Amino acid sequence: MRKPCNWRAPFVARTDMNASGNYLKKGFSLSALTQAVMLSGMMALGAASAHAADVAEESVQPAIKSDLAAHTLLVDAAVAGDRLVAVGSRGHIVYSDDQGKTWTQANVPVRQLLTAVYFADDKNGWAVGHDSLILHTSDAGANWEMQYRDPELDQPIDPEGPSLLERPLMDVWFKNANTGFAIGAYGTFLRTDDGGKTWEDRSYDIDNPDGFHYNAITAVKGAGLMLAGEMGTLYRSPDFGDTWETLTDLPYDGSWFGASGTSSDNVVLVWGLRGNMFRSTDFGDTWEQVELLTPNNGPLEATLLGGGLSGDGKLVVVGAGGVVLSSTDGGNSFDVMTRPDRI
C-alpha cells in the first residue's frame, strides 16, 4: 500500500526537444518549434492533487477522439523524422507532417494527462504522464500502446485510511531504441534496457533521501546526462545513466522546470522560477546566471517552463504569460519577447 505524503511543488507544463551528440534530434524550423510548444498557450499546469484512491477507481480507457484535440492543452512536443508529435491533456497525442500547419489525432489507450514525449529514432517514441504511465509507439506516433502503469494503483486501498496521492512521471529520455529512463514525482527513476517491455525502479541509484521531484532530464553533448528537480537539486551522469553524482555547489534553491544541452560540448542550461536561468560550460562544475531582460530592459520575472534545441542550434525556452526566449549563441544571451495574443 502506498505511503501517504504531501505535494511539495506544483507540476509544470514543459517542452523538451533537447538532445546531444549522437542523440541529436533531426532539425526543424524555429517557427514550427514555437508553434508546437506554444499550442494552447503552454500554460503551467496547476498543482496535481488527484487522489490515488480516485485514480484507482478509473479503468484505463482510450482517449476520446475529437476534432479539437490539437486545440486542447498540449505540454510537450518532439520530432519523429519529419513529423512533429505533441502530447497533453486527456491522453491527447497529435502529430503533424506539414510542420504544424495541420494536426491528426493519434490512437491512444489512456485518458490521463501526458507530460512528456521523446523519440529515440524516426519510429520509436515514448510518452509519460500521470499514474506513472509510459506509452510506446513504433510508427512515429500514429498509434500508441501502454507499457507501464504505477503498480500500486492496483493494490487495495483502505477506505478508512488517509487519502493517497499519485506519482506522475514528468520526463523521459532514451539513449537508443533499447535503453531509456523515465523520471517524476518523489524521486521516481525508472529504467528499461529492452525498449520498454520491462521497466525497473532504479530510484535508489540516485542520492535523494528526501524524495524531491525530478522535472527534467537532458543529454549534454560530449558529457552525459543532467537531471534537474525541485529545491535546486541537480544530478549528472557521465556514463549516460549508469551512475549518478549529486551536484553540491548549486546556484539556486528553487525548483528547476527545464534543462537543455546545446550544440557545444559540456554546455548545459537549467531554468526555473522567476526568470532564473543558469548556464554551465563544464557539465555542472561551475554555473553563471544568464541575464534575461524584458523588451523594456527590466529583469525577467516570469517562471520558465519548457525549452528545446532545434536542428540548427537555436535554443528556445518558453515561460508563463506567453514569454518566449531565443538564443543563437548557445545560451550565452537570449532575445526575450511576449506573444502578442498574451499581452
Predicted regions located by residue number:
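N-terminal secretory signal peptides that target proteins for export/translocation
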Residues: 1-28
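N-terminal processing/targeting junctions
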Residues: 8, 13-17, 36-39, 45, ...
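Gram-negative bacterial Sec-dependent N-terminal signal peptides
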Residues: 18-49
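Residue-level hotspots at or immediately adjacent to binding/recognition sites across diverse folds
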Residues: 37, 51-343
